[in-house]
Amino acid sequence: MKRFAAVSLAALMLLTVFASAASAADVIEIRGPVYNGSDINDIIDTYGENNALTIDATKFAAFYYDIDDNVTTETLSILAVPGTEGNVIGEGGIVYETTIQQVDYEFYRPAAGWSNYSLIGFFAEKYIPINPDKADKLAKLVLDSDDKYTIRTGEQLDLGEGYSIEAKQVDVDGEKVWLEFTKDGEFVDDEIISVVSGSDNTWEVELDDIQDEDDVVVLRVHVNQVFQGAVDSIAQIEGLWLIDYTNAMKIESDDEFGNLDNVKINGDTLTITNEDTFTLTRDDEEEIAEGLFFKTADDTRALRFYAMKQITEPGTYEIRGEVAEGDFSWDATNFAGFFYDVNDDVSTESLTVTGLNGGNVIPEGGLVYETTIQMVDYEYSKPSVGWDQFPVLGFFAEEYIPINADKADKLAKLVLDSDDKYTIRTGEQLDLGEGYAIEAKQVDVDGEKVWLEFTKDGEFVDDEIISVVSGSDNTWEVELDDIQDEDDVVVLRVHVNQVFQGAVDSIAQIEGIWLIDYANAMKIESDDEFGDLDNVKINGATLTITNEDTFTLTRDDEVEIGQGMFFKVADTAASDLRYYPFVEKTIDGEVVDDDEDDDNVTEPVDNDTEVEEPTEEPTEGPTEEPTEGPTTEEPTEEPTEADGTTPGFGVVLGLVGLLAVVYLVRRNN
C-alpha cells in the first residue's frame, strides 16, 4: 500500500513538473472572409457564382499580393461537386491553384537590368520558380530589397538563412570592389564589380544543378558606390535579391500536401485538389495544407467558417483588409485585423470610406470608425457556475473590456481569457501577463481549500480562500474600486478546479482565467484625437470617430488612420486608386542567428548620407524588429524567480520528490 501511494505520488509530481514547464507559443491568425449559411451549398450559392466560391489575395490577407502591380497568384475555391452537402466538401471540391506572375524588383531600375522577375505564391509563402515558365521547381524568396547597406572590407552582410556577402577588397582607385558570396560560411562564388560610368554595377550569381536546372540566378547585387579612404575601404550596396536555392524543391504529381493530394502541373500553373471528402467539423480547425486551415464555428444551428493561416515565427506581420478601389466599408468579415468571435458570430468594429468621387481625397466626415459593445462567451464557458458571457469592444483592432458594460467611454485591454488548465504548487506564481500574477499561498490540510494571492508588478492587490467542496462555484472574483472613477469593477476571475494536499506537495489546479489590464484603463473624451480621426461621439454602447479635416490617400504611401491602423495605397496612375486598411501584429522572441558567434559579421544599415557601422539586418520590405506587442498572452506556468539559465523551482522540487519516493520504495522493500 505504501509503495502504491509512493508511486502514485511520483506520477502526479512528474505530471506536474511537465505541466509547469509547458507554455503556449504566441500565434497570429490571419483569416479570410467569414462565410455563414445553413449548409455548404447555401454558402456557395450566397457568396460564390457558377457553383464555385473562390478566395484570392484581395480578400485573404495570407495570400501573396503586390498592391502596386495588383498582382495575385493564389486562389482557394470550394466547388459544388457531387458529395458536397451539409458540412462536407466532396472529392475534388477544394481547389488550390497558383500561377506564376511577373512582379517588379523592389530596386526597380529597368535601365540597369532590374525590371521584373517571376514569382509564385505557394500556400501563402513567396517562392521563385527555378524555370520561369514552369511551376514544378520552386525556391523560397529570401530577400528583395532596395535599402542601402554600407559595408567595410573584411565585413560580412548577413542576408538571412545562412547566406552572406563579404567585401574582400576595394581597389586603390576606388572604382571596383571584390565581393564574396557564402552559405553557412562556405564559399559559393566571388566577383569583382566595377562602378565606373557605363557599367550596370550588378553582380548576378548563376549556379548549376539546382533541381537539375543550370544557369539559375540565385543572387543579384547592385553596388551603388565604392570608397577608398585613408582609414576605411567601403562599398555601398543598393539592390539585393536572393533565393534559398539550397532548399529548392521539386513538386511531383504524386505529392501530398495535407488534405490536398491530387497534384496537376500545367506549365506555369499548379493545381492541387482533395481526393477524399473534407469535413468542416464544428468547433475545430481542419488543416487544408501547409499551414492553411478552415476554422469552423461551434454552432449547430448554422455553418460558419473561414480560411486562415497560423503564424508562430517571431516577427511583425501585416494583417490587411479587402482591397478597395473607391468608396468601401470594412468589418470583421472582410478585415482580419478587426476583433471577431466566430463561435458567437460577434464583431464590433467597422470602418467606412465615402465621398471619394473618383479621386483620392476623403472629405470631412467621410472616414468613419465605429465600434459597439457586444456580449461574448467566456473561453471557459460554464453558465451553471457563473461563467457565461462578458461585454467586449474592439478598439482599433484590439480587444477591450468596457468598465461599464453599457458605456463605451471607459476601456481596459483584455489580457487573458483562457480555459486551459494550469497546475501550481504552494509558493509558486502563475504569470498572467502584463505584470499580473497569482500565487498559491497555502492549501488546507483537508485538501478542500486554497489560499490565492493576486499581485501586480510584485505588489499585493487582493487575496482569497477558495473552497472546492461540492456546492461551491469554486470561482474567485477580484473587484476593485476607483477604476476610472468606477467602483466594484471585476478585474480578475479565477476558477479553481481541484486542490491536492499530499505528503510532499500541495497543489491547486486552475481551469478558467479572465483578466483585464485595469492598471492601464483609459477614458475616452469627446475632445480626444486618434491620429487623423478627431471627431469623437459616444452614444451609450457605441463609439463613433470621424475626420474633421480632409484625408488624402497619398499614392505609394502608408497613411495612418489612428492608433496603429493604416491605409496602404498603391503606386498607381492619377486616374486609378487602390488601397486597403491594415494593422501590424507582433510575435515576440528572438530569431536564431546562425552566425552569431562570428565577430566579423556586419548587419546592414540603411544609410543615405554618411558612413556608419552597419547595424540593420535586411528583410523583405521594411525592416521590422520584433517588439513587445499588445497581444493577449497565454499564462506561462513558471515560478517568477526562475530564469533562462537555471532550472525552475518546480523542476528542482520535482526531482527532489522523485528521489525521496525512490528512497521510500527501496526502504519498504
From Swiss-Prot:
It comes from the Archaea. Residues 588-648 are annotated as: Disordered. InterPro entries: PGF_CTERM, S_layer-rel_Mac. GO terms for biological process: cell wall organization. The keyword Mitochondrion does not apply. S-layer protein. The S-layer is a paracrystalline mono-layered assembly of proteins which coat the surface of the cell. Belongs to the Methanosarcinales S-layer protein family. It comes from Methanosarcina mazei (strain ATCC BAA-159 / DSM 3647 / Goe1 / Go1 / JCM 11833 / OCM 88) (Methanosarcina frisia). Glycosylated. This is Major S-layer protein. The chain crosses the membrane at residues 645-665. Keywords: Cell membrane, Cell wall, Cell wall biogenesis/degradation, Glycoprotein, Membrane, S-layer, Secreted, Signal, Transmembrane, Transmembrane helix. Residues 590-627 have a biased composition (Acidic residues). Residues 1-24 form the signal peptide. It is found in: Secreted, Cell wall, S-layer; Cell membrane.
